[in-house]
């Protein structure tokens, strides 16, 4: 399943992020706010379990609590920019990290770090990365988690293009993809157009090449 959000709050915040005049701080703030809005919908099919509690009025109440582990896995480094927004909404979630970068000469994905919590294989895994461009980083991350036996993986990105969507859905048809926007295309350097620019540079205030 591919879900592209249509929500006025997300659209307005995303427009702010797209502007080259937006400061690093405002870029980060809007990214976290959009991530919070997106994870709300991403967790819609999460299965809870029934529990019994007593209210301050000494009344028994049959309610719900989270049943399975939720693990947020940002793809470094840009995925870190979405983490706080999600953790504000799901503070009990655990966090893993996958470090990848793209070799600018070969466009190949290079992994340099991988660490995730020891959790059951039916845990709810949410991979986050602002950009879904060629889909190579996402597929490499999903493949590694799939090989470890995780069977409930979702991919949450701000913007993506058809090329990346097709690559992920072809290799991993059971992985749901959530996007704030589907953009037009990639340029000759595999950057998304109209896009956001280099999300990592804009999050962390590093020099934009």
Swiss-Prot record:
Pfam families xrefs: UPRTase (PF14681)
Residues the record lists as binding 5-phospho-alpha-D-ribose 1-diphosphate: 77, 102, 129-137, 198
UniProt binding sites for uracil: 192, 197-199
SUPFAM superfamilies noted in UniProt: PRTase-like
Keyword Transmembrane attributed: no
A molecular-function term among this protein's GO annotations: GTP binding
Keywords: Allosteric enzyme, Glycosyltransferase, GTP-binding, Magnesium, Nucleotide-binding, Transferase
Cofactor binding, per record: Binds 1 Mg(2+) ion per subunit. The magnesium is bound as Mg-PRPP.
Pathway recorded for this protein: Pyrimidine metabolism; UMP biosynthesis via salvage pathway; UMP from uracil: step 1/1
Alphabetized HAMAP family for the sequence: Upp_B
Protein name in UniProt: Uracil phosphoribosyltransferase
Annotated source species: Metamycoplasma hominis
């Amino acid at each position: 399943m591919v879900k592209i959000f249509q929500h006025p709050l997300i659209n307005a915040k995303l427009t702010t992020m797209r502007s080259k005049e937006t400061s690093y701080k405002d870029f980060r703030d809007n990214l976290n706010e959009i991530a919070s809005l997106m994870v709300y919908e991403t967790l819609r099919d999460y299965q809870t379990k029934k529990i019994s509690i007593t209210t301050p009025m000494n009344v028994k109440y049959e309610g719900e609590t989270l049943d399975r582990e939720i693990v947020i896995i940002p793809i470094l480094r840009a995925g870190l920019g979405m983490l706080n927004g999600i953790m504000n909404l799901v503070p009990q979630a655990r966090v893993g990290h996958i470090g990848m970068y793209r070799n600018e000469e070969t466009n190949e994905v290079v992994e340099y770090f991988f660490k995730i919590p020891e959790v059951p294989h039916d845990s709810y895994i949410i991979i986050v990365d602002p950009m879904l461009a060629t889909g190579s980083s996402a597929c490499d991350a999903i493949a590694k988690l799939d090989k470890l036996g995780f069977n409930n993986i979702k991919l949450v990105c701000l913007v993506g293009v058809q090329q990346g969507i097709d690559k992920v859905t072809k290799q991993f048809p059971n992985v749901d993809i959530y996007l704030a926007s589907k953009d037009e295309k990639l340029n000759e350097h595999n950057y998304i157009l109209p896009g956001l620019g280099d999300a990592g540079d804009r999050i962390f205030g590093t020099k934009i090449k």
